Structures are given as C-alpha cells and as structure tokens.
Regions:
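Nucleotide-activated donor-binding/catalytic signature segment of Leloir-type glycosyltransferases, i.e.
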Residues: 236-252
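Aromatic "clamp/platform" in nucleotide-sugar-dependent glycosyltransferases that forms part
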Residues: 253, 272
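Conserved acidic donor-binding segment of nucleotide-sugar-dependent glycosyltransferases
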Residues: 304-305, 309-316, 325-331
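A conserved mid-protein helix/loop that constitutes part of the nucleotide-sugar donor-binding site
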Residues: 17-28, 190, 194-213, 230-237, ...
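A conserved, positively charged/aromatic
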Residues: 110-141, 149, 156
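A short, well-ordered alpha-helix in the C-terminal region of glycosyltransferases
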Residues: 220, 318, 325, 332-347, ...
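Acidic anion/phosphate-binding donor-loop and adjacent secondary structure
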Residues: 67-71, 149-154, 160-161, 166-183, ...
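Short hydrophobic beta-strand element within catalytic cores of glycosyltransferases
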Residues: 41, 289-292, 302
Length: 366
C-alpha cells in the first residue's frame, strides 16, 4: 500500500468562525490511510485548535504579522517543499491571499483555494487580490451554487476551475433531541431564535420587528439571539424601544451551539447576504423549524413549504406572517422540521462533504 498523500489545509486562525469550522471538520473527516493531513495557520490558539489536537491532527503555525510579511511566505514555501506536501488547500480570504502565492512557489504542489461568500461585500483591495490568486490555483472550491454562479458571472473565474462542495456538519452532535432548556428559557411556551454573529449583514432588526408584532399570539413565547458582534448594543436598544426586551434573551457566542439550537422551536435567519449558512444547516439538523430570507444559498437549504419557509430580505411583514402561521399550526411546524432534519442528514453531513472533497483532491492529484 502506498504512503498517505501529504496535504496541508490552511486558514488564518483556529477559533470560532464558519471557515475555521469547515477546515476542522474536513481535517478530522479525511481518511488518514489516504491523506497525511496537516493544518497550517497564522494563529494556532482557539477552540478549533483544541479540537484538532484532540483528534491527533498536526498543527503548523506560520507567524504572519501582516499580509505584507515576506518572511512568513518563505516559511510556508519552505515547509511545503521540505515536507513533500502534494496539495495545499486554503479555506479563507487571508489564507487565499497569502498562502496561495506562497504555496505556488513550491513547484509541483497542487493548490486549491476556497470561496465561501459573495465577494461584492469585500473591500475592493481584497477583491482585486483574490482575482489575482484565482489565476494561481488549480481549483476553486465553493460551498453553494449561489457562490459558483457569482464566481463565474461576476468574478469571471473560468468555469472549469470551480468545484462545488457543500459544507458538512457533524450530525452526531447536531441532532433532534429535546432536553431541558437553558437558563432563561425554562418557562417559555415556544422559542423563536437565531445563532449567528451579530453583524449588519445578518438583518437582525427585521427579526426583532417581526417578533414585536407577533409575541402576543402565544403566551410565554420568547426570542433568543445567541452570538456576539458589533451590533449587540444597537439590537438591545431596539428591543428595549420595541418593548420586547423582557421577552428577549441575548446570549454571547458559545461553543455550546447544539444545546442552544435544540432549545429553539422556530429558527429565523433574516440575512441580507449569505452564502451557505452553517448555523442554518445546524438548526435544521437539530429539529428546528427554519424560516430564512430568500438570499444567497438559503434557498438551497430551505425549500419553501417543504423543509421550511422563505421570505424576502427586510420584509418584516412577510416574516411576521410566516411566524404567525407556524406558531398557530404546530402540525405544520413539526412536519417542516422533520423533513428538514432528514434533508440535512442525507445531503449535508460531514461524511458527504468529505467524500466530495476527496473526489476533488484525487481528480487533481491524478
């Protein structure tokens, strides 16, 4: 039997974040008999680093004080050559901008980048830099059909370079179980909620406004927002102004994501922009009834009327209408939640994602 193929997966850091999570899931899911997986990063501290070490995945830190650091690039290139790395796969913007050129100088190594978001939201300098690195890679992996179209139609990337590999989640962790609700929600009759970063593009004002219009429908209904970010104070002020703060719970970002999702009945993702949302997939896997804005990759996860409900971004009335229907009709709520959980288990498990990525890797390695 031939020796496992050395591969290096790269990301800026190993803490909370969607790209960091997907890298960790992939590193732990790839067949060790076929791939000698190492993880490279600029900053090794963080929760994902702890998970990877516990799983026995080697972590190599390449200190990079800034993207202009030439020494850091030389270290990456030297490591790739010395270790005989045959494939380098970068998972986020910083790794794409810095790791791709460094790995390319190492010679025969195959280089893959990732695109997991709409580049229109990026600073122009970053977007230009990524367009340059698009011409240095052997493949670009995207996580949804929306991003694939964006890369071809707007970024003018060659269609043959683009490979679709949906994100995968650990369905042994994110599963349909209902236990005791966390503190602050024990007395709730029904919980509406979201788990996400509290950033402007998440459109969370729409959720607060819609909740204000429907909270009287069900005695004891509560709203929970789990996450941290720059919009926290503004969202709390808005909840206070709307008079709903007593029925709202703001919980900081936590690694106990599954526990919170399993306490939510109606998961609402009102994003203004989205690629493929890990939190939406995880919520559906946990048995939440999903309600999401019709943007980006959300419709690839939520089929309206089958695995959840969709509404137009910023449409407070449309979201409120969906919430009223689902609060009143428990049978429909349960049906949509059950069908969503089945869809996630069958199409978006980390095993399915790893199988697809292996197809991409082996196709490039020959």
């Amino acid at each position: 039997m031939s020796a496992p193929t050395p591969v290096l997966l790269m990301v800026r850091e190993l803490d909370l974040g969607g790209s960091e999570r997907q890298l960790a899931e992939m590193a732990m899911s790839l067949d060790r008999s076929r791939f000698d997986v190492r993880v490279g990063c600029f900053h090794a501290a963080g929760m994902r680093g702890e998970e990877l070490r516990a799983a026995g995945v080697p972590i190599v830190e390449f200190p990079v004080p800034s993207l202009a650091s030439f020494k850091g690039a030389l270290r990456i290139a030297a490591y790739v050559r010395e270790q005989g790395i045959r494939l380098v796969h970068t998972f986020d913007t910083s790794a794409n901008l810095y790791g791709v050129p460094a790995a390319r100088t190492a010679g025969t190594t195959r280089v893959i980048s990732s695109q997991r978001a709409d580049r229109a939201l990026m600073p122009p300098l970053y977007r230009h830099g990524l367009r340059v690195t698009d011409h240095l890679v052997d493949a670009i992996v995207v996580n949804c059909e929306f991003v694939r179209r964006h890369m071809i139609e707007e970024e003018k990337a060659p269609a043959g370079l683009i490979h679709l590999c949906y994100n995968g989640i650990d369905t042994s962790v994110f599963r349909c179980i209902r236990g005791a609700r966390p503190q602050g929600l024990q007395d709730a009759s029904l919980v509406v909620g979201v788990v996400c970063a509290l950033r402007p593009e998440k459109g969370l004002e729409t959720l607060l406004d819609a909740f204000a219009s429907i909270r009287g429908l069900e005695p004891g209904v509560k709203l929970v927002l789990v996450g941290s970010g720059p919009c926290l104070a503004d969202l709390q002020h808005r909840a206070r102004t709307l008079g709903i703060l007593p029925d709202c719970l703001f919980e900081a970002a936590t690694p106990r994501v599954a526990e919170w999702l399993q306490a939510i009945d109606l998961f609402v993702l009102p994003s203004l922009s989205e690629a493929l949302s890990n939190s939406l997939m995880e919520a559906m896997a946990c048995g939440c009834c999903a309600v999401a804005s019709r943007v980006g990759g959300n419709p690839e996860l939520v089929r309206h009327g089958e695995t959840g409900m969709l509404f137009q971004p910023r449409d407070t009335a449309g979201l409120a209408q969906a919430l009223r229907l689902l609060i009143h009709d428990g049978s429909l709520r349960g049906k949509l939640a059950s069908q969503a959980a089945c869809a996630i288990r069958s199409r978006f498990s980390r095993e399915a994602s790893a199988e697809r990525m292996v197809e991409i890797y082996t196709g490039l390695l020959g």
